[in-house]
UniProtKB/Swiss-Prot annotation:
PROSITE patterns: 3HCDH, ENOYL_COA_HYDRATASE. GO terms for cellular component: fatty acid beta-oxidation multienzyme complex. The record marks 119, 139 as: Important for catalytic activity. The lineage of its organism: Bacteria, Pseudomonadati, Pseudomonadota, Gammaproteobacteria, Enterobacterales. This is Fatty acid oxidation complex subunit alpha. Heterotetramer of two alpha chains (FadB) and two beta chains (FadA). NAD(+) binds at residues 324, 343, 400-402, 407, 429, 453. Involved in the aerobic and anaerobic degradation of long-chain fatty acids via beta-oxidation cycle. Catalyzes the formation of 3-oxoacyl-CoA from enoyl-CoA via L-3-hydroxyacyl-CoA. It can also use D-3-hydroxyacyl-CoA and cis-3-enoyl-CoA as substrate. Pathway: Lipid metabolism; fatty acid beta-oxidation. It comes from Enterobacter cloacae. It catalyses: a (3S)-3-hydroxyacyl-CoA + NAD(+) = a 3-oxoacyl-CoA + NADH + H(+); a (3S)-3-hydroxyacyl-CoA = a (2E)-enoyl-CoA + H2O; a 4-saturated-(3S)-3-hydroxyacyl-CoA = a (3E)-enoyl-CoA + H2O; (3S)-3-hydroxybutanoyl-CoA = (3R)-3-hydroxybutanoyl-CoA. The gene is fadB. One of its GO terms (biological process) is fatty acid beta-oxidation.
Length: 729
């Protein structure tokens, strides 16, 4: 053994060939700050070996290196810029030393090589991979850019276009694509990986492969003519601005850095990467996006913990076909849980099966599946008009019309048709679960399971605990949702649960703005372009359905009369009375026509102004800041109330439910992250300017207490120790 650290070791393999093996104590290798320092120490030893002829880099885990340790990021981002820059310089000096070894080097890469893991293997001369490889640089999705030389080495290896496509989008690619673009030199079976890597290394040592020529382009400026460079970077910048937009500075910064470094050698180019990385790491966007990653891990970890002692349902059933039922049935079958889909109408069953078939056909068209797989999945969805097959299902989700009487009747009838241990769930979006449970003999086996439309795209499933719901029931439904590839978040029961409860105060803020003379077009524009929502409130209401929103608004008003009962006729009422139900019938706030792809495209419709004039004061202009404040304060206040009342368990779960269920702009990180970034004291000052607008604008007492001490909702993060000192670690 030449060197042994906590996460890697260095050993002789055979005659003059050393192996450097990443082998962290946990289940995966991460390139954390300690591992980077340890890599430097291993290289100290390696550089002193006079008999060294070659070096093989590999991993002892199922994945090579999953990336940097993102749990370190928030504390690293708080380190002063100069110190962070120093540490990056130190880290890059380690990778440069790996690249500059006076012998040929190869990485034997299995599984994931992401972020720092990818940057590490880019520093070796050759890369041999297994078929399960996923390699790439996802940093821009975390609000930063590659910091260990990825933006320097990858363009010089692959060419600017291929590298920018991976770096700007935060992409990873599989083995076949990686070999095609030159990111790896070959792909072999896992059992042949080390043997194959050694064979390449021996050829390089013997002079059959020119490893110095392979290394040289990574040390030199990018080989691009002036015209090629102009075209390449102009197109890339245009595309990045179009897709990422102004709210995500990392992708455009990465492209501009690659452009600026194109005519420089490696060491000067790395200085530019350093200069670009450090300011990005100090942005609110980076903190928010890293926060989302960490929250996602927290939520998924909680789901794993909840389900560790229960068996995942093997057979499921859906009550109510149609678009939603068909979507749930498809998702369950697609992920390997056969499903019985029941409806009382042949027409609805056909609609549900058509929806499932349509989604499978899309997978077929994209080349994700073949005809055999399509037939196999569709055959596991059994459409029935009666209860045949219900005696063998483990879980049933009801997705019939949003009417308490209908739902109660269907649930009570179904309870008599299933085994005593079968779990029942309702896909209601607003009706309290404890109310629906009142007709059941086994309320402990019942909970809410709120999917979001379209089911196959929306990651969130709210799992709602009723008054009498057992822990085992919650665990089984969470297990099924996880098996379906969803992110389940457990919430306690109340009208609207969490997501709809906080959405309708937002819609109420919108209605009040319209009442006071604001133009819905401007509101949509401000909330989309300035705040960053994927859809403005008018557009979102049209997509949800004005009739659906009108009904849900009444349910929410009955549930929270003090705040959500209104004493005026609003825009939703006016459109509902005029039979303008949104996208579903082509007329809402906007008019909809099908585009060439058969998707609804919104257009302006002057008729709506006349309808809104009846429920609005004369038109007046509001500033962007006023619109954002009046829209967001009711939502934020309600989110805080939900935390204070125990409807949602933590700020992390609240933020993930908003991002995954409503499309809350990820660069804000969610409601609590946005609140912490703004500062509770500043938020209180802003909200108090609008408290005359009514109870929705009154800040909850718990938030007032936080504001008095300017406390955050997320635990305070301490800056990492002066990371420049890691040079001597």
């Amino acid at each position: 053994m030449l060197y042994k650290g906590d996460t890697l070791y260095l050993n002789w393999l055979e005659d003059g060939i050393a192996e450097l093996v990443f082998d962290a104590p946990g289940s995966v290798n991460k390139l954390d700050t300690a591992t980077v320092a340890s890599l430097g120490q291993a290289l100290d030893v390696l550089e002193k070996q006079p008999e060294l002829k070659g070096m093989l880099l590999r991993s002892n885990k199922a994945a090579f290196i999953v990336g940097a340790d993102i749990t370190e990021f928030l504390s690293l981002f708080l380190v002063p810029e100069e110190q962070l820059s120093q540490w990056l310089h130190f880290a890059n000096s380690v990778f440069n030393r790996l690249e500059d070894l006076p012998v040929p080097t190869i990485s034997a890469v299995n599984g994931y090589a992401l972020g720092g893991g990818c940057e590490c293997v880019l520093a070796t001369d050759y890369r041999l991979a297994t078929p399960d490889l996923r390699i790439g640089l996802p940093e821009t999705r975390l609000g930063i850019m590659p910091g260990f030389g990825g933006s320097v080495r990858m363009p010089r290896m692959l060419g600017a276009d291929s590298a920018m496509e991976i770096i700007a989008a935060g992409k990873d690619v599989g083995a076949e694509q990686a070999q095609k673009i030159g990111l790896v030199d070959g792909v072999v079976k896992p059992e042949k990986l080390v043997e194959g890597a050694l064979a390449i290394l021996r050829q390089a040592i013997n002079g059959d492969l020119d490893w110095k020529a392979k290394r040289q382009p990574k040390l030199e400026p990018l080989k691009l003519s002036k015209i090629e460079a102009t075209m390449s970077f102009t197109i890339a910048k245009g595309m990045v601005m179009q897709t990422a937009g102004k709210h995500y500075p990392a992708p455009i910064t990465a492209v501009k850095t690659i452009e600026a470094a194109a005519r420089l050698g490696r060491d000067e180019a790395l200085k530019l990467e350093n200069q670009s990385f450090v300011p990005l790491a100090h942005t609110n966007e980076a903190r928010a996006l890293v926060g989302i990653f960490l929250n996602d891990q927290f939520v998924k970890g909680k789901a794993r913990q909840l389900t560790k002692n229960v068996e995942t349902p093997k057979h499921a059933a859906v009550l109510g076909a149609g678009i939603m039922g068909g979507g749930i049935a498809y998702q369950s079958a697609w992920k390997g849980v056969p499903v019985v889909m029941k409806d009382i109408s042949e027409k609805s069953l056909t609609l549900g099966m058509t929806e499932a078939a349509k989604l499978l056909n899309k997978q077929l068209e994209r080349g994700k599946i073949d005809g055999l797989k399509l037939a196999g999945v569709i055959s596991t969805i059994q459409p029935v008009l009666e209860y045949s097959g219900f005696d063998r299902v483990d879980v049933v989700v009801e997705a019939v019309v949003e009417n308490p009487k209908v739902k109660k009747a269907v649930l009570a009838e179904t309870e008599d048709k299933v085994r005593p241990e079968t779990v029942l769930a309702s896909n209601t979006s607003t009706i309290p679960i404890s109310e629906l449970a009142s007709v059941l003999k086994r309320p402990e086996n019942f909970c809410g399971m709120h999917f979001f439309n379209p089911v196959h795209r929306m990651p969130l499933v709210e799992v709602i605990r009723g008054e009498k719901t057992s822990d085992e029931t919650i665990a089984k439904v969470v297990a099924w949702a996880s098996k379906m590839g969803k992110t389940p978040i457990v919430v306690n029961d109340c009208p609207g649960f969490f997501v709809n409860r906080v959405l309708f105060p937002y819609f109420a803020g919108f209605s009040q703005l319209l009442r006071d003379g604001a133009d819905f077009r401007k509101i949509d524009k401000v909330m989309e372009k300035q705040f960053g929502w994927p859809m403005g409130p008018a557009y979102l209401l049209d997509v949800v359905g004005i009739d659906t929103a009108h009904h849900a608004q009444a349910v929410m008003a009955a549930g929270f009369p003090q705040r959500m009962q209104k004493d005026y006729r609003d825009a939703i009422d006016a459109l509902f009375d005029a039979n303008r139900f949104g996208q579903k019938n082509g007329l809402g706030f906007w008019r909809y026509k099908e585009n060439s792809k058969g998707k609804p495209k919104k257009e302006e419709d002057a008729v709506v102004d006349g309808l809104l004039a009846d429920v609005s004061q004369p038109k007046r202009d509001f500033t962007d800041d006023e619109i954002i404040a009046r829209m967001m304060i009711p939502m934020i206040n309600e989110v805080v109330r939900c935390l204070e009342e125990g409807i949602i368990a933590s700020p992390a779960e609240a933020d993930m439910a908003l991002v995954y269920g409503l499309g809350f702009p990820p660069f804000h990180g969610g409601a609590f992250r946005w609140l912490d970034t703004l500062g509770s004291a500043r938020y209180l000052d802003m909200a108090q300017q609008y408290q005359h607008l009514g109870p929705l604008y009154e800040v909850p007492e718990g938030l007032r207490n936080k504001a008095r001490h300017n406390e955050p909702y997320y635990p305070a993060v301490e800056p990492a120790r002066p990371v420049g000192e890691l040079k001597t670690a």
